[in-house]
């Protein structure tokens, strides 16, 4: 993808080690190829998986690392073969920026499951340069892994949809969890969970939020629009709710028992795992086989599904609940995220930070 054009130097906020502390970092973008677009970043959401990568919790982090995979910006340059986008258009970049394009997953519009997928950050581009994410002034991205932001969708609202939004939209479409009136449980009410409530309601489902305490009950019911709220530590209420749900989307990103939630499913019910949990999870098989229940997993979504998510949310007027912060606040935001002290997604106003000035 090389070219003779001059190199572009940009500034981002990078972690230098597993402490995860982010500070200004200047680096060179890879050269623009014929199918690349250069995106000036305007907003970038903060995801829990950013913490996982920054702190090397999976044991595969490379530093310096500029996180951020819920990127919204404007196209400033395009390669000679770019047909999808024009300079000046608002676009989004999600969790992946490359794949092999020849395997069965890629050919089946499931690029997120390609074994050679390239992560938006903490990975290596085809040309050998490291990928860096959206906590930076600009990015170079292959047009195939860029989506268009609908005109009636506020840019800051679009950012969480590029990860949290498509993470729930994709399994709902794939597993047929879109029939109005069906009962869906949302386990965990964080960034992904709150989008689960909103998108499930937009599909016409009856939504029950399941949480470990009643701290978010009023907000879940009155603000997010959930139909019911279940405290998992209330054994009596959990028993009353047994075999009442058609589906559960499990968004919890830490180790937790599965048995209490499998018991909530009807016959043929599905528990879909969405959280990245590095420890083993345990359950007893009778809870599955005596109700023909199933446990499945789902990972973000394809590029096609990501565009669908944006278009669906724009059409249905589905908004994310966000707190917009500047890059000068980003380390505090990360500390608050560890404590689950955000309703429900931080979005960084990157453009306001004037990184390259």
From Swiss-Prot:
Gene3D superfamilies: Medium-chain alcohol dehydrogenases, catalytic domain (3.90.180.10), NAD(P)-binding Rossmann-like Domain (3.40.50.720)
Cofactor requirement: Zn(2+)
Species the sequence originates in: Picea abies (Norway spruce)
Protease as UniProt keyword: no
Cofactor, free-text remark: Binds 2 Zn(2+) ions per subunit.
EC number: 1.1.1.195
Residues the record lists as binding Zn(2+) 2: 100, 103, 106, 114
Lineage of the species this protein comes from: Eukaryota, Viridiplantae, Streptophyta, Embryophyta, Tracheophyta
Alphabetical list of SMART domains matching this protein: PKS_ER
Record-listed NADP(+) binding positions: 49, 167, 188-193, 211-216, 251, 275, 298-300
Protein name: Probable cinnamyl alcohol dehydrogenase 2
Summary of the function given for this chain in its UniProt record: Involved in lignin biosynthesis. Catalyzes the final step specific for the production of lignin monomers. Catalyzes the NADPH-dependent reduction of coniferaldehyde, 5-hydroxyconiferaldehyde, sinapaldehyde, 4-coumaraldehyde and caffeyl aldehyde to their respective alcohols.
Molecular function (Gene Ontology), one example: zinc ion binding
Enzyme class: oxidoreductase
Name of one Pfam family that matches: ADH_N
Biological process according to GO: lignin biosynthetic process
Self-association and partners: Homodimer.
Keywords, comma-separated and alphabetical: Lignin biosynthesis, Metal-binding, NADP, Oxidoreductase, Zinc
Catalytic reaction equation(s): (E)-cinnamyl alcohol + NADP(+) = (E)-cinnamaldehyde + NADPH + H(+); (E)-coniferol + NADP(+) = (E)-coniferaldehyde + NADPH + H(+); (E)-sinapyl alcohol + NADP(+) = (E)-sinapaldehyde + NADPH + H(+); (E)-4-coumaroyl alcohol + NADP(+) = (E)-4-coumaraldehyde + NADPH + H(+)
Pathway stated in the Swiss-Prot or TrEMBL entry: Aromatic compound metabolism; phenylpropanoid biosynthesis
Residues annotated as binding Zn(2+) 1: 47, 69-70, 163
Family: Belongs to the zinc-containing alcohol dehydrogenase family.
């Amino acid at each position: 993808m090389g070219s003779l054009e001059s190199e572009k130097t940009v500034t981002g906020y990078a972690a230098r080690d597993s402490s995860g502390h982010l500070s200004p970092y200047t680096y060179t973008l890879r050269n623009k190829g014929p199918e690349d677009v250069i995106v000036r970043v305007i907003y970038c959401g903060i995801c829990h998986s950013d913490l996982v990568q920054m702190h090397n919790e999976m044991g595969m982090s490379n530093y310096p690392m500029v996180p951020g995979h819920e990127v919204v910006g404007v196209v400033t340059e395009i390669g000679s073969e770019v047909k999808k986008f024009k300079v000046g258009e608002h676009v989004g970049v999600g969790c992946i920026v490359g794949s092999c394009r020849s395997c069965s997953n890629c050919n089946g519009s499931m690029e997120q499951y390609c074994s050679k997928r390239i992560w938006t950050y903490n990975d290596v581009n085809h040309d050998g340069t490291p990928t860096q994410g959206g906590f930076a002034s600009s990015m170079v991205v292959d047009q195939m892994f860029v989506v268009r932001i609908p005109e009636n969708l506020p840019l800051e609202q679009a950012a969480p949809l590029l990860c949290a939004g498509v993470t729930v939209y994709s399994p709902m479409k794939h597993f047929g969890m879109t029939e109005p009136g069906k009962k869906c449980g949302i386990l965990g009410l964080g960034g992904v969970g709150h989008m689960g409530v909103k998108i499930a309601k937009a599909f016409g489902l009856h939504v029950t939020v399941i949480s470990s305490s009643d701290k978010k009950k009023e907000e879940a019911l009155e603000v997010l629009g959930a139909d019911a709220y279940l405290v998992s530590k209330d054994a009596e209420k959990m028993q009353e709710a047994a075999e009442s749900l058609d589906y559960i989307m499990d968004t919890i990103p830490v180790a937790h028992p599965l048995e209490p939630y499998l018991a909530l499913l009807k016959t043929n019910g599905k528990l879909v795992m969405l959280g990245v949990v590095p420890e083993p999870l345990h359950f007893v098989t009778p809870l599955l086989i005596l109700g023909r229940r199933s446990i499945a997993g789902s990972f973000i979504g394809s590029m096609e599904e990501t565009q669908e998510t944006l278009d669906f949310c724009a059409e249905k007027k589905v908004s994310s609940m966000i707190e917009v912060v500047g890059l000068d606040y980003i380390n505090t935001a990360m500390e608050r995220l560890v404590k689950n002290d955000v309703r429900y997604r931080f979005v960084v106003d990157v453009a306001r930070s004037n990184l390259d000035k």
